[in-house]
């Protein structure tokens, strides 16, 4: 035993020198067996650890590789034998020159910026390696002298390997003052290996590359990033919980997430199998109490709430400054249904231990052998995971510009909590966070997600004003990466372009938003996302001849295309064309969110209500709507919104051979489709406060509210157009409000400025008393529908505020703005109950708009327009002008007139607020916002503003609402947002 230790130490001390094999049998070439792979020196290797990494690779034909696939640039220039080791071969290491490998592929695997950055990283690594070579040799000598101590940790046979010069932490009990060099036989980095983390890359959106030229071989040399990392032992590591992401993980614990444990069949000979000695002040977590997620993709879709769990304010890091992260001394908790204990049934050969280094921003990884008698079998030392160097198989970027892992996880949590599902459904949440922890999410997606969600994070508000500009730094990098790869269609690029379009719409970059949205549509068409792949849409059995596509990947393709469809309808709300035709879509609607989370295949309908061809009849349920959730019905209602916009704003009304009131008109067909949508809505999806709470429990509360807000908005906007003449159209009056080309689509409403210079109202509508009764009934029903829809929108927004549901979609702001205009007219009407209810709801609308304008710059234009509308009504009332019902003089055939009254039964009933229940206090700041002096006598509008004082509405953020849900005592203003 002592002889083996002596031999191991001898090789370890010689690792920084020539690195030749110590086996005398290798000097005799005659003893090399035929067909045996040879090392770079032409001799047979005595141990697997001494074989170069490329010897285990396969050729394109699938055979064992027998020679070096590619030499470094220096060896090629000198025409000498190259060992092929990475990051530095023997020749370059001997002459202290940078070792650079050039890709042998004719196709560009990454951009020119990334190649330059990769070469710079290798050069810096080599400089650091040369600078500390003597220091490392002294450290190895110290290790040799301490080896004879009885309590020392045994070394592993894998140290007998040629010098690949990885760096790991010292294995001594006392921290060294310098880093220690240890050889590594595997040139592929642990963080970029595809075999070390137990996840399925096939079902991951990040690896779902649907073009053949995007499929990269993980074992290819160009897909391997250097495994040279630096660790300093000057500062003792700080330990936290070693756990992976869970779908129910509180946001306060996200910053303490550590990488997943490797699969039991994973082997990493490049890593030492000995544990790193951790100082006594670190935390030892017993194995029997440590829980990790064995497979997030199989996690049951059971969520506590989309409200964040209550934690102390000091530990709630989402609202603390970025430079001061509080780290709690406890492991994050997981539900019993979604975790697996570290028992005998789940005991990998070795468990990872990560050691931080604040000085060099590196990472060292070692393994704890479960069979080592000198280590504690009941504890696992864990420390915070730092950022690994991104693999060049994905679009890379300078690490200095990449957000820290903690911030990335935080912004991803904010994205799923505030954005995902309200605008687009793009990602599978468990798989996304698993890939994010494994650093396998394409950087273009990481930057795009950070760009959209940064505006909602209080960590970014301290450094950026206004808040909607907080993500611009990440958007710039996402644009660069997207434009570098725009000619290579990929599912991840489509998602990133959609998010960039959404971000630019919020920063008032309407041109960029329009163009990035168009690029996403083109790329989706190139990937044929509008068609099902193969003859088996559900992947029930492998009957297709081509490569099998899992249900999750198929569903991600569908959801990505439906997100493109929604973006097209949002962006084309006015004069812009709609590019996607409903007749060209041949995919089914998204499945229910619970089925999607559990990765269970389900049959749904297409947009026109059909079942896809090729689906076996045995798997088709009696009612396909059982498999359809909020996402599917959201697509259907937005499709109806697009049809209404096309009729009213894109010359559809002129091409209609029938007048709008006729039963056979296109207007009537849209009205019937809206009624059929509401009538066919399952009972579980009909709006109620209980339904909101039920969907809130599965993190679908905001999406559920958005569904019904979109329905009432579409119905109100459609019937608001009744009675408008060619000279009284908001499309001509409020063109400055409707931001053309913007993803934020603002619907038109009827608002005509009043000329009161002579005390007379100039109105284009002809108040003809001889108008027939059919026209009067039609216009009265249309106005009643608009007012009921407006009050329903305010009630849903108020319910969201009471249940702490965060509304952030810009499309919601469009509906709230329309409701404000309708209610402003009713607030000054002759109906007392309708006026008092409208005045109560006006504040709900205004509070949300004033809140959302901090996060979407284009909404500021709507707030300014609301102030003009309000001032117009005040001026009209002050002049003594009474509003009269004006009915256009048009002859309507009552027998052929469309039926509007049937819509009343599906409009959500809102409570009536009597005038006596309204308060007599006013908000001075809101009055001054609308152009009034703070001390103005406004008693004639008694009850317009309830008692809430909104002096601090500009300082309030969405974070204050979330803080209230977590029990933050500093919360004092409740905004619906």
Curated annotation (Swiss-Prot):
GO molecular function terms listed in the Swiss-Prot or TrEMBL record: DNA-binding transcription factor activity, RNA polymerase II-specific; RNA polymerase II cis-regulatory region sequence-specific DNA binding; zinc ion binding
Subcellular location as annotated: Cytoplasm; Nucleus
Feature: compositional bias, Low complexity: 177-195, 364-379
Pfam family, one: Fungal_trans
Entry-linked InterPro entries: TF_fung (IPR050815), Transcription_factor_dom_fun (IPR007219), Zn2-C6_fun-type_DNA-bd_sf (IPR036864), Zn2Cys6_DnaBD (IPR001138)
The entry's DNA-binding region: 72-99
Region annotation Disordered: where it falls in the sequence: 1-65, 176-195, 287-307, 357-380, 751-774
Composition bias, Polar residues: 1-24, 751-770
Superkingdom, natural source: Eukaryota
Keyword annotations: Cytoplasm, DNA-binding, Metal-binding, Nucleus, Phosphoprotein, Transcription, Transcription regulation, Zinc
Biological process, per Gene Ontology: DNA-templated transcription; regulation of transcription by RNA polymerase II
Positions of post-translational Phosphoserine modification: 220
GO cellular component annotations of the record: cytoplasm; nucleus
Claim: Phosphoprotein is one of the keywords in the record: yes
Keyword field contains DNA-binding: yes
Protein's name in the database: Uncharacterized transcriptional regulatory protein C1327.01c
């Amino acid at each position: 035993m002592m002889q083996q230790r002596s031999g191991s130490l001898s090789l370890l001390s010689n690792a920084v020198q020539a690195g030749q094999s110590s086996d005398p049998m290798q000097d005799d070439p005659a003893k090399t067996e035929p067909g045996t792979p040879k090392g770079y020196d032409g001799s047979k290797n005595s141990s697997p650890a001494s074989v170069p990494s490329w010897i285990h690779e396969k050729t394109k034909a699938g055979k064992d590789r027998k020679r070096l696939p590619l030499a470094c640039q220096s060896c090629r220039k000198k025409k000498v034998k190259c060992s092929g080791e990475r990051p530095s071969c023997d020749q370059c290491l001997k002459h202290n020159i940078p070792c650079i490998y050039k890709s042998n592929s004719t196709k560009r695997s990454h951009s020119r910026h990334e190649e330059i950055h990769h070469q710079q990283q290798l050069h810096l690594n080599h400089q650091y390696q040369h600078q500390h070579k003597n220091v490392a040799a002294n450290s190895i000598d110290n290790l040799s002298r301490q080896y004879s101590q009885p309590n020392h940790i045994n070394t592993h046979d894998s140290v007998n390997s040629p010098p690949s010069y990885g760096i790991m932490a010292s294995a001594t009990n006392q921290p060294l003052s310098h880093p220690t060099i240890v050889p590594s036989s595997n040139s592929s980095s642990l963080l970029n290996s595809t075999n070390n983390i137990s996840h399925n890359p096939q079902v991951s959106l990040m690896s779902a590359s649907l073009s053949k030229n995007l499929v990269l071989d993980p074992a290819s040399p160009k897909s391997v990033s250097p495994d040279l990392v630096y660790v300093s032992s000057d500062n003792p590591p700080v330990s936290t919980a070693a756990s992976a992401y869970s779908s129910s993980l509180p946001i306060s614990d996200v910053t303490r997430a550590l990488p997943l444990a490797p699969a039991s069949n994973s082997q990493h000979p490049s890593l030492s199998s000995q544990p790193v000695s951790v100082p006594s002040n670190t935390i030892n977590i017993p194995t029997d109490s440590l829980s990790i997620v064995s497979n997030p993709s199989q996690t049951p879709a059971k969520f506590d709430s989309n409200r964040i769990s209550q934690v102390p304010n000091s530990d709630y890091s989402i609202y603390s400054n970025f430079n001061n992260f509080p780290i709690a001394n406890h492991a994050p908790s997981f539900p019993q249904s979604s975790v697996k204990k570290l028992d005998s049934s789940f005991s990998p050969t070795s468990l990872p231990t990560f050691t931080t280094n604040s000085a060099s921003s590196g990472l060292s990884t070692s393994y704890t052998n479960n069979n080592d008698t000198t280590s504690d079998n009941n504890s696992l030392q864990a420390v915070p995971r730092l950022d690994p160097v991104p693999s060049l198989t994905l679009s890379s970027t300078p690490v200095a510009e990449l957000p820290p892992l903690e911030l990335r996880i935080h912004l991803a949590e904010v994205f799923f909590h505030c954005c995902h599902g309200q605008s687009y459904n793009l990602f599978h949440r468990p798989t996304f966070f698993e890939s994010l922890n494994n650093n396998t999410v394409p950087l273009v997606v990481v930057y795009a997600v950070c760009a959209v969600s940064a505006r909602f994070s209080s960590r970014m508000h301290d450094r950026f004003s206004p808040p909607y500009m907080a993500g611009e730094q990440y958007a710039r990098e996402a644009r660069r990466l997207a434009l570098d790869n725009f000619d290579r269609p990929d599912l991840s690029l489509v998602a990133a372009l959609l998010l960039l379009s959404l971000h630019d719409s919020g920063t008032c970059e309407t041109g960029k938003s329009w163009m990035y949205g168009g690029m996403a549509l083109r790329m989706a068409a190139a990937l044929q996302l509008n068609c099902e792949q193969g003859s088996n849409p559900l992947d029930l059995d492998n009957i297709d001849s081509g490569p099998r596509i899992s249900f999750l990947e198929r569903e991600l393709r569908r959801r990505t295309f439906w997100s493109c469809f929604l973006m097209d309808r949002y962006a084309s709300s006015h004069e812009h064309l709609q590019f996607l035709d409903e007749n060209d879509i041949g995919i089914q609607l998204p499945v229910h969110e619970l089925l999607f989370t559990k990765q269970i295949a389900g049959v749904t309908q297409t947009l026109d209500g059909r079942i896809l061809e090729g689906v076996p009849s045995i798997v088709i349920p009696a009612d396909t709507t059982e498999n359809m959730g909020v996402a599917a019905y959201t697509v259907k209602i937005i499709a109806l919104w697009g049809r209404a916009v096309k009729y009213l704003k894109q010359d559809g009304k002129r091409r209609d051979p029938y007048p709008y009131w006729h039963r056979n008109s296109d207007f009537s067909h849209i009205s019937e489709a809206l009624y059929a949508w509401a009538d066919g809505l399952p009972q579980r999806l009909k709006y109620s406060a209980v339904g909101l709470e039920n969907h809130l429990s599965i993190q679908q509360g905001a999406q559920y509210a958005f569904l019904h807000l979109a329905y009432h908005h579409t119905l109100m906007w459609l019937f608001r157009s009744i009675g408008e003449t060619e000279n009284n159209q908001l499309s001509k009056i409020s063109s400055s409000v409707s931001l053309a080309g913007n993803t934020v689509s603002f619907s038109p409403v009827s608002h005509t400025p009043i000329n009161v210079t002579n005390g007379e109202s100039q109105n284009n509508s002809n108040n003809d008393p001889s108008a027939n009764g059919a026209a009067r009934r039609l216009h009265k029903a249309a106005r009643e529908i608009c007012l009921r829809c407006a009050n329903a929108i305010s009630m849903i927004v108020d319910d969201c505020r009471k249940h702490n549901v965060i509304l952030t979609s810009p499309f919601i702001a469009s509906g709230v703005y329309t409701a404000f205009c309708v209610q402003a007219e009713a607030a000054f009407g002759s109906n007392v109950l309708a006026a008092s209810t409208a005045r109560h709801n006006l504040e709900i609308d205004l509070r949300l708009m004033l809140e959302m304008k901090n996060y979407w710059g284009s909404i500021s234009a709507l707030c300014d327009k609301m102030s003009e509308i309000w001032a117009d009504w005040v001026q009209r009332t002050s002049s003594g002008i009474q509003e009269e019902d004006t009915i256009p003089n048009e002859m309507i055939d009552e027998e052929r007139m469309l039926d509007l009254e049937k819509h009343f039964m599906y409009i959500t009933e809102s409570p009536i607020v009597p005038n006596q229940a309204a308060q007599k206090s006013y908000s001075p700041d809101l009055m001054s916002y609308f152009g009034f002096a703070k001390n103005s006598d406004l008693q004639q509008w008694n009850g317009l503003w309830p008692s809430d004082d909104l002096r601090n509405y500009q300082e309030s953020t969405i974070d204050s609402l979330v803080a209230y849900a977590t029990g933050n005592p500093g919360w004092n203003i409740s905004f619906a947002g």
